[in-house]
Amino acid sequence: MSTNPNTPAPPASRTNPISLRIYKAIGTSFDDVSSREALEIASGMYGPEDPKAKVKAQPEYEELEEDDDTLPKRRTLKGQSAAIARKYLKQDIETCLATGSTKFLEAFAEVDQKLNVLREHMQEMQVRCDQVQSELDQANSGTKFLLERADVLRSQRDSAQLRAHLITLFLSRFTLSNSELTALTSREVTIGQPLFDALDHVEKIRTDCEVLLSGEEGKAQAGLDIMSLTSEQLESGYSKIHRYCQFEFRQFTREAQLEASSVMRQAICRLRDRPALLADAIQTLTSTRQSSILHQFLDALTRGGPGGLPRPIEIHAHDPTRYVGDMLAWVHQTTATEHEFLEGMFGVKEKKRWVGQERGGEEGEEERMASEVLDKDLEGLSRPLKLRIQETIKSQEGIIMTYKIANLLHFYLVTMRKTIGGKAMLVQTLQEIHDQAYIAFYETLDAQGRGLLRFLHPPDATLTPPITLRDAAQILRELLFVYSTSLIDPAERESDADLAKLLDKAVGPCVEMCERMAEMRRGKSGGGEWERDIFMVNSLGYLEHTLEMYDFTTKTLHMLDEKIKTHVESMTFEHHGKLLESCGLAAVMRTIRTRPEDTPLSRLHATSPKSLTSALSKFSTWISTVDPSTSPRLALLTSPRLAVEIHRKALRKIYDAYGEICERVLDKAEGYEFGETMLRRGRDEVGVALGVGEDWELEEDTEEKSMKQKEQQDEDTEDQGEKGIMQEEHKAQDAGNTEDKA
C-alpha cells in the first residue's frame, strides 16, 4: 500500500514525543550564521583522528584534550563522533566555561594589581597638582593688579589706535598732500594737471566740510578752520594761474604765436570762478593783441609783407575800390584768424558754423567771452580804417566809384556782422562809414539829377532819347550792375529800401527831364501832343530797356510801363483821327455821333446819299493804298512793336467805324433806299484789306509776341555786349588785385 508523502499524519501521531522531536528537528533552521558557527565549533571538538598520525592502542573511550583556544578536543574513533558528542557535549561545554572563567579571574587579578599601582601614582599626582594650584592661586592673587592694569592699557591702546586711524582718515579727506601743496604754492612747479587736480581736491574738501559746519560746536570749529585754510590754498592756486595767464598772454604778439594749448584753455576755464582775476588777465590779452593788430595793419599799409610781398596797400591808393577793398579784406582776414584763435582759447564748442556764416541762437558763456575779447582786440583798427576810407570817399567825384565803394562797404558790413555780431565796435564803425558812403553817393546822385534839369533844350527832329538821358541811363546801368553783385538775398532785393531810393533818385529826374523837354518841343514846333508822345515813348522806352536787364526793378518798370501806355493810348487816338480824316469818313462819323435822335442820317448834309457815296468812294480808294503793317507817321518811334500796335489799333477803329456805317446804311430807319449799292466793299473785305478782320486779336497777339521776341533778342544782344564790357573791366581790376596780392 503506497502512502502519499503530502498526506497529513493522523491526530495520534501529533502527541507522540518522538514525532514531536522529529518535527522539531526537521523544522529547526540552521541557516543563520551563529548556528553554523556553533555547529562548526562542535564538529571541531569531536572530529575524527588523522589517519596519518601514529597509531596507538585506543581505549574504550576517548580522553579529553584541550587546544590552545580553550576548546575541548576529544579524540574519537572513526564513526564514533556523534555518539561521543551526545555523551560529553554538556560536560565539555561546562568544563570549557570553567576553564575560561579561571583564565579571566587570573587576568583580572593581574589587572587589579596594576590598577592599585596606578591609583597610588594618581594620588601622588593629585598631591602635586594641589601644591601647584596652591602656588598658582598665590601668584594670581599677587598679580591681579598688574593684570587689571594691563587690561586697561590694552583697551587704551586699542582706543588710541582707532583714534589714530580716524585722524589719519580725517586728515586724508580734509587736508592736502605735500605734492598738492607744492603744486598750489611753489613757483618752481609749472602749471599743469597736478595743479588742477589739487584745486579739485580743495573744492571737494570744502564741499565735504559743510557737514562739519552743521554739526556740534567742536566739529563746527574744525570745519571753520578747514574752510579758512582751504580758502587760502584756493587763492594761492588761483593767483598762480592768474600769473601764468598774464605771462602767456604777453607772448601773443605775432600771428605765428597764436596757438592756445590745452593747459591755457583749462587755466582760463578755472579763472571763471574768479571773475576779477579773469578780467585782469583778459585785459592784458586785449591790450597785447590790440597793439599787435594795429601795428600789423599799419605795416600792411606802409611796408607790406616780409620781403616786400604782398606789396603795401597804400601803393594802390590811386585805385579807390582796390585800396578800400584791400584794407577791408585785410581786416576781414585778421578778424577770421583772431576769431578762430579766441574760440580755440576759450574752448568754444564746434557747431559747424563757417566764418562769415550768420550767427544763430543764444550765445553760450564761451562765445560771449570770445566775442567781447575779439571786439576789444579789433577796436584799434576802427580809427585808422575810418579815416582812410572817409578820405577816399570824399576825394571821389564820380558817382559810379562812390557807389562801388559804398557797395563794397555794404558787402563787408554784412560779412562782419555775421562773423562778430552787430554790437561790435568795428561793425559799428563800418556801419558809420557805410552810412556816410551812401550819403555821399546819394548827394552825388541828387547833384546828377539837378544837373539833368538845369540845362534843358527841346528834343531834336528825330525825337530820339537825348544824349543826357543816354548818359544817365548808362550810369544807372552800371549802378544796377554793381548792386546785382551785392550780398543781398535776391528774394529781398525787390523790397530793399536802398534800391528803391536809388531808383527813385536816378529814374525820377530822368523822367522829369523828358517831360520838360517834351513840353518844350510841343511849344516850339507846334507839333502838339503827337511829337510829345513820340518823344516820351522813345525816352521812357529807353529807360525801360535799361531796367529790364535786372529782375529786381519790377516796381519801377511797372511805373514806366504805365506812363508809356498812357502816351500810347494818346497816340492811338490821334493816329486814328488822322487816318479817319485821310480815309474820308471823319465827317460821316462826326455826324453819326452828333445827330439828333429823331432825324434820319439820310436827311443830314454830311450823311446824305450823295455825300455818303462820295465819302465811301474816297474810302475805297484809300483802303487800296494804305499799308496795314505800319505808317510813316510812326517812323520816329524807336520801338517797332509799339508802332505796329498803335497802327493796328487805329486801323481796327477804322474797321469798326466802317462796320457801324454799314449798319446805319442798311438800316431802313435811316432812309437810304439803295443802301446795298452805296456800299462798294463789304465789311469783311475791308477787314481783310486792313488786316484787322475777325481774327485780328489772335493775329495781333501772335505778331506782338514775335515783335517782343525780336526786340528782346536785340536788347539781349546789346545787353550782353554792355555786360561783357563791364565784366571785362571788373575782371581786369580783379586780375590786378590778384596779381598784387600774390
UniProtKB/Swiss-Prot annotation:
Topology class, membrane: Peripheral membrane protein
One of the record's GO cellular component terms: Golgi transport complex
Protein name: Conserved oligomeric Golgi complex subunit 6
Keyword terms of this UniProt record: Golgi apparatus, Membrane, Protein transport, Transport
Family: Belongs to the COG6 family.
Basic and acidic residues bias (residue ranges): 720-742
Entry-linked InterPro entries: COG6, COG6_C, COG6_N
Gene: COG6
PANTHER family from the UniProt entry: COMPONENT OF OLIGOMERIC GOLGI COMPLEX 6, CONSERVED OLIGOMERIC GOLGI COMPLEX SUBUNIT 6
Lineage of the species this protein comes from: Eukaryota, Fungi, Dikarya, Basidiomycota, Agaricomycotina
Bias-annotated ranges (Acidic residues): 694-703
UniProt record, GO biological process: intra-Golgi vesicle-mediated transport; protein transport
Positions of the UniProt region annotated as Disordered: 692-742
Subcellular location: Golgi apparatus membrane
Keyword Protein transport set for record: yes
Source taxon at top rank: Eukaryota
Physiological role: Acts as a component of the peripheral membrane COG complex that is involved in intra-Golgi protein trafficking. COG is located at the cis-Golgi, and regulates tethering of retrograde intra-Golgi vesicles and possibly a number of other membrane trafficking events.
Keyword flag Membrane: yes
